[in-house]
From Swiss-Prot:
Modification after translation (UniProt): 4'-phosphopantetheine is transferred from CoA to a specific serine of apo-ACP by AcpS. This modification is essential for activity because fatty acids are bound in thioester linkage to the sulfhydryl of the prosthetic group.
Gene: acpP
Pathway(s): Lipid metabolism; fatty acid biosynthesis
Originating organism: Maricaulis maris (strain MCS10)
Domain Carrier: 2-77
Protein name per UniProt: Acyl carrier protein
Disulphide bridges: none
The organism's taxonomic lineage, starting at the top: Bacteria, Pseudomonadati, Pseudomonadota, Alphaproteobacteria, Maricaulales
Entry's Gene Ontology molecular function annotations: acyl binding; acyl carrier activity
Gene3D superfamilies linked to this entry: ACP-like
Compartment(s): Cytoplasm
Length: 78
């Protein structure tokens, strides 16, 4: 498992209180993991803090799945 995926998964598990098995690349934060819009905002903020990056609002709107988050963060941190 990549470092980014591992760290994103840990944040998702902690913030959404879901089982690790449910956190997959294709898992939608809202549809599969039970997040609401406030949870999404909190996740984005947690990703920003964990990876010391800024995720613009327009980009945050497109981060709908675990895989989306991993891809965006991987591109930002190199």
């Amino acid at each position: 498992m990549s470092d980014v995926l591992e760290r994103v998964s840990k944040i998702v598990i902690e913030h959404l209180d879901v089982e690790a098995e449910k956190v997959t690349d294709k898992a939608s934060f809202i549809d599969d993991l039970g997040a609401d819009s406030l949870d999404n905002v909190e996740l984005v903020m947690a990703f920003e803090e964990e990876f010391d990056i800024e995720i613009p609002d327009d980009a945050a709107e497109h981060i709908q799945t675990v895989g989306d988050a991993v891809k965006f963060i991987s591109e930002k941190v190199g």
